[in-house]
Amino acid sequence: MTLQIGVIGCGAIGQDHIRRLTRTLSGARVVAVNDIDPQQARDAVTKYGLDAEIYGDGHEVVAAADVQAVLVTSWGPTHEAFVLDAIAHGKPVFCEKPLAVTAQGCMRIVEAEVAHGRRLVQVGFMRPYDEGYRALKHVIDSGEIGAPLMLHCAHRNQSVGERYTTDMAITDTLIHELDVLRWLLGEDYTSAQVVYPKKTRHASAHLADPQIVLLETASGVRIDVEIFVNCQYGYDIQCEVVGENGIAKLPDPPAVGLKHAARRSVEIMTDWKERFIASYDVELQAFIDGVRQGALTGPSAWDGYAAAVAADACVRAQQSGAVEPIAMAERPAFYRG
């Protein structure tokens, strides 16, 4: 069976997913598209040679008789309504982050999915599909380094645009760490604090950069995450787990080591899409396979809710300077196991 997918949102990430659905992945094809800018939808159909219907409204894509699953890559504030509509139609939906722009919105999706009685939602957190993170989790779960005590992490971007704001360091950048570190450790966060080092001269006037986020988990693991979105030198993701008996570190992407002119060097990537390109492929293929097999296994609506609750606390901590509690609702049995 070839899974027939409708895509809502034909911007950069939407077209990137259309590209992989059309040229890289197997078992699916795009049969319907929509974008708030109709020309973008038409351009996507032309660019990728799609035999797809262009709809004027995303809800029409969800309702289309030939659409068996939905891909939501539209503007963040529209995600909740489209995901809820897909659940109401009983159609599996892959939603790029954020699942919703508030924790309350994520909870509404959780409640709708639980009421439906079957997992239909996968959230676009791709780092759990990265080979390096998977290898790191294997080491942690094996017990080789003992119980994790501390994590030292960094999320560095070469630069960001003028529209990037201080809170986006949490909602657009740290959100990936909030998901993947919770997955690595298998436990939830209990508190967050944000501190501000000396500001880089490369940041715009309205942006606090860099920032350091301090998290604590239910078992007492302490996590520090450096967010530096104007680091200049490249795109760099770091994660070091300090255990009772040893240390495990996320590997850097493979690169050729160069010795030349009395120097030893290794190239550093500058594009986040390049750094995690394989993970994007694997996560979307997992969604396709999960729908076809009747069992989604990727990041769930509950994972989207958990990340949103933690992000809300981090934003409060940015503003208050205090240690902010992270209080989550009880996890439904539907999402356990």
UniProtKB/Swiss-Prot annotation:
GO terms for biological process: inositol catabolic process. Its EC number is 1.1.1.18. It catalyses: myo-inositol + NAD(+) = scyllo-inosose + NADH + H(+). It is an enzyme of class 1 (oxidoreductase). SUPFAM superfamilies: Glyceraldehyde-3-phosphate dehydrogenase-like, C-terminal domain (SSF55347), NAD(P)-binding Rossmann-fold domains (SSF51735). One of its GO terms (molecular function) is inositol 2-dehydrogenase (NAD+) activity. Keywords: NAD, Oxidoreductase. It holds the Pfam family GFO_IDH_MocA_C. Involved in the oxidation of myo-inositol (MI) to 2-keto-myo-inositol (2KMI or 2-inosose). Belongs to the Gfo/Idh/MocA family. Homotetramer. This is Inositol 2-dehydrogenase.
